[in-house]
Amino acid sequence: MLVAAGWVVQSRDEANLHAARGVAVREFKLLPGHGFADYLLFVDAKAVGVIEAKKEGETLAGVEIQTEQYSVGLPPKFPAPIRPLPFLFQSTGIETWFTNRLDPEPRARQVFHFLRPDSFADQLATDAVLGDSAPGILRRRLRAMPTLTDRRAHV
């Protein structure tokens, strides 16, 4: 699934974060007390998200908490555009859930495929291009829109 979405999958012992725009590193060791992420996702050599993989048939209930713990456990020597990491996946290979912490009200949603590295890069760059200091997504930008005045009342 990751390879089909454009990710290069590597083991932690042979990781080369510059091998491609999107690199998924297996069994990535996090800070003490945070365990190992099944996959840590890097875009342009910067950590952006985590994946917790479960066996087919296992429930994903409660796994979102595990990925949230992983998202705050990135060792400081690894660059990340945002901490805690904003993109969290839980997957059995059949069922996949995704939480985008750039959303103003983040929550896990079922998705049918992993996002491509370019999609993450676009989301992280969107507001930087617009001159806003905080990355965001459409829902956040829509909430920041000014109130429209009703010009009909002034005719």
Give the positions of each predicted feature.
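ATP-dependent helicase/translocase motor core
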Residues: M1-V155
